[in-house]
Amino acid sequence: MLLDEIKNLNFLIMGLGLNGGGVALSRFLLKRGAKLVITDLKSETELALSIDALRDFEDQIRYVLGKHDVNDFKNADIVVKNPGVKPNNKYLKFAKRIETDISLFLMFNKNPIVAVTGTKGKSTLVSLLYQALKEKYPGVKLGGNIGVSPLSFFDQLDGKSPLILELSSWQLQSLENFNPIISIITNVYNDHQNYYLNFDDYIIDKSKIFVNQTSGIVIIQDQAYCKYFSKFKSKVRVILFSEFNPCDFDQDIFYCNEGKVYFNGNLIGSFSNSRAVFIIPKVITFFVSYYLNIDLNRTGQILSNFKGIEHRLEFVKSVQNVMFYNDTASTIPESTVLSVKSLKTKDNRINLIVGGTDKELDFLSFSKIADIVRTWILIRGSATVKIIKILEKSSIQYFLFDSLRDAVNYAFKISSPGDIVLFSPASASFELFNNEFDRGLQFKNLVNNLG
């Protein structure tokens, strides 16, 4: 499909949503003359902000809200689905052709792509890569699963500067001929098992980031490569990375030891790092800078000054010398475990707020932090039921609350000066919140109102 053919096609947008992706997709098509049917199970009231952002194109849009109509799927030339819609959705079987915003973007994009996926750490890594690459490539752009559709800046692309894309497994699922110049898999944990039939399907979707790559390099965590990805054939050079202790086998590998970065045993540079939770994205960024011949001294400064990004182990404020951290983006147990370990104090003064909606995961990894967490504060939810079973099995005391407000107030009440209150739910958010970002914002508002 060519850009000037868009005006001759009828598109059905399945899922307008509230996070901007559906709006960016719609505006991209509408500006090029397309006629749209936009359908979403949410109501007009719920979607008011997104609908308002499309007011300039009212004569080109027909809305079907609160339901889906099978005839709209039959009549559309192309159905563009939200990545979160499962491919076996009953309405999609009537579609002539199915795309996503990412697959549409890739049809027309000419910029080289640095692609990042992984269960956790994607957003932190792409944010660091963006800062580092900007030093050499002023036209670099950042988009994808981080909350910015690349279609929103399509008209600003210069055809030559790197484009950094954060991609979830859902977004990769529909990309059959994806060909970045650098692909990166940060890690793999059991996640989204409420979406996938099995873990193997999840791995297959993750592998689509590199299986059709024809140039450049693939960067994969050594443990993930050993367990899951070595069976997939790569046409390009595979380079592994390790946080501290690399796997013992014959493969290109880089790793970090006390701030010093080594590639195949040779020191390539160093940077200072005080927070263990950011070590993996930092060492990957350092190596990518090395590979792209970016000034490593400047990259080291960027890494040393990095304070994190919103909702990922974000320091909110200190209230009466009690430090509050917002880690709402930790939606799986392993991520919460890593966050707790990174904030570990000598006298174990972490009061952990955890719990939420189940994603068909287990919480056995919580045993690794049982002796680090001082107080377990739980928010009621379907995942919380599983957490309670783990804690009770180990005879660990916990305190259960019906709301985030009550949990925050209790955490503050029991905390002494020097304590840490960490909100790291290890669960999805949908029983009490719109999404994890809404959950994080509510937490920060509650903390800011404490004093």
Curated annotation (Swiss-Prot):
Q: What is its EC number?
A: 6.3.2.9
Major localisation:
cytoplasm
The record ties this protein, via SUPFAM superfamilies, to: MurCD N-terminal domain (SSF51984), MurD-like peptide ligases, catalytic domain (SSF53623), MurD-like peptide ligases, peptide-binding domain (SSF53244)
Q: Which GO terms describe its molecular function?
A: ATP binding; UDP-N-acetylmuramoylalanine-D-glutamate ligase activity
Instruction: Give residues annotated as binding ATP.
Output: 118-124
What reaction is this protein's catalytic activity?
A: UDP-N-acetyl-alpha-D-muramoyl-L-alanine + D-glutamate + ATP = UDP-N-acetyl-alpha-D-muramoyl-L-alanyl-D-glutamate + ADP + phosphate + H(+)
Which pathway does the database say it acts in?
Answer: Cell wall biogenesis; peptidoglycan biosynthesis
Q: Which GO terms describe its cellular component?
A: cytoplasm
Q: Name one GO biological process term.
A: cell wall organization
Q: What is this protein called?
A: UDP-N-acetylmuramoylalanine--D-glutamate ligase
One Pfam entry name = Mur_ligase_M
* Keyword Nucleotidyltransferase part of the UniProt annotation: no
Function, in words: Cell wall formation. Catalyzes the addition of glutamate to the nucleotide precursor UDP-N-acetylmuramoyl-L-alanine (UMA).
Q: Give the HAMAP family listed for this entry.
A: MurD
Q: Which UniProt keywords apply?
A: ATP-binding, Cell cycle, Cell division, Cell shape, Cell wall biogenesis/degradation, Cytoplasm, Ligase, Nucleotide-binding, Peptidoglycan synthesis
Regarding protein family, the annotation reads: Belongs to the MurCDEF family.
Write out the annotated subcellular location.
Answer: Cytoplasm
